[in-house]
Design a protein with these regions (language model features):
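Conserved AMP-binding/adenylate-forming
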Residues: 1-92, 98-101, 126
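AMP-binding/adenylate-forming catalytic core of the ANL superfamily
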Residues: 55, 60-61, 83-180
Length: 180
């Protein structure tokens, strides 16, 4: 049975986009389903912005919560809180969550999920989380990646200093990442 990536959220009953077997593209969740329109609001220089969805499948509002409804529904467009972009074929890629964005001192947006995807390429990493670090005054002063490793793979690969190897592998994996 073929398996493909798709994207959906509860407020959109739940389908929004799905890959098709005849046009799979790496790192996308595919094309909008037939009754759905997708637009990217306020895209940055790389095309990433908030994913907005319009269609018959979009909810009418949150039950007994008109304030929350007004925050996310505008002229029939639902603001998902997810960030992504559309490629030149119209396929959707998800890059992160609005509430997870880390804003650097230079004003650039960092999507921790994007960095995590690159780190997950490392064969002995099972899970990773990237987050902003803060100084004693609460000001952001850097990024940190914490990983959970597969100890069996570490042993099979003959790695004796996991921290040292992880640091080297992260720097290698992130060479493909855009410069922020």
């Amino acid at each position: 049975m073929p398996i493909v990536n798709a994207y959906g959220i509860t407020e959109c009953s739940p389908g929004v986009a799905v890959n098709r077997l005849d046009s799979l593209t790496y790192n996308t969740v595919g094309y909008p389903i037939p009754c759905v329109e997708i637009r990217i609001d306020n895209p940055d220089e790389s095309g990433n912005g908030e994913i907005c969805v319009k269609g018959d499948n979009v909810m009418l509002g949150y039950y007994n919560d008109p304030q929350r409804t007004a925050e996310v529904l505008h002229d029939g467009w639902f603001r998902t809180g997810d960030y992504g972009n559309l490629n030149d074929k119209g396929q959707l890629s998800i890059t992160g969550r609005k509430k997870n964005i880390i804003v650097l001192k230079n004003g650039k947006n960092i999507y921790p999920e994007e960095i995590e995807d690159y780190i997950m390429i490392i064969p002995y990493v099972n899970e990773v989380v990237v987050y902003a670090t803060r100084d004693e005054d609460g000001n952001q002063n850097g990024l940190c990646a914490e990983a959970f490793v597969d100890q069996k793979k570490v042993e099979e690969m003959g790695i004796t200093d996991v921290a040292k190897q992880f640091k080297a592998d992260v720097f290698e994996a992130l060479k493909e990442l855009p410069v922020y």
